[in-house]
């Protein structure tokens, strides 16, 4: 994961870290279409839940997109890639119970997202929004997406070995920790 920072936003390698099986299919199609650079598909071995029903997976072609939005204006945006998107979705349900309105953004490819128009980028991740990033990598890997008003929960050490549910609990990749981290972030 830490090596991905060497390539995020760069043209040297197209990196995809999809959130579920359907998003993986779109990323695989883009990998097969990409004839100009190597492509890295960063996949999980976990049994990850699918994104919410009705999701427009073709928007993954833009690198980042809204997978779930609040019914009215949001209080915070949660952004992640890969398996962490599922943790954000679960955490958003807990936040909703506290009347915190959440937008969830899946960002399978920051490099592709940065190639979109400024208008599209601002529509998905407005610069003045409070944005919380969740990553199983170094926090710096999402810093460019969360911006100056945001924060990232991530890891600074690697190499742990245990069943993924044990690691998620120990390292904080649970709905409960997303809830806690976001609540703390919103009162800063």
Task: Label each residue range with its predicted role.
Residues 16-20:
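Active-site nucleophile and cofactor-binding loops and adjacent substrate-binding regions
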Residues 29:
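Hydrophobic alpha-helical positions that pack around
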């Amino acid at each position: 994961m830490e090596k991905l920072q060497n390539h995020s936003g760069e043209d040297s390698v197209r990196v995809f870290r999809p959130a579920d099986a359907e998003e993986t299919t779109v990323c695989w199609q883009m990998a097969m279409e990409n004839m100009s650079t190597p492509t890295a598909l960063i996949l999980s071995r976990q049994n990850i839940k699918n994104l919410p029903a009705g999701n427009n997976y073709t928007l993954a072609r833009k690198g980042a997109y809204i997978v779930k939005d609040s019914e009215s204006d949001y209080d915070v945006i949660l952004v992640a890639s890969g398996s962490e998107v599922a943790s954000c979705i679960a955490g958003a349900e807990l936040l909703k119970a506290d009347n915190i309105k959440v937008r969830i953004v899946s960002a399978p490819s920051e490099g592709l997202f940065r190639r979109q128009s400024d208008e599209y980028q601002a529509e998905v991740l407005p610069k003045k929004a409070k944005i919380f990033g969740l990553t199983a990598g170094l926090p710096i890997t999402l810093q460019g997406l969360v911006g100056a008003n945001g924060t990232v929960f991530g890891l600074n050490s690697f190499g742990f070995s245990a069943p993924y549910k044990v690691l998620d609990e120990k390292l904080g990749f649970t709905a409960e920790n997303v809830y806690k981290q976001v609540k703390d972030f919103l009162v800063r």
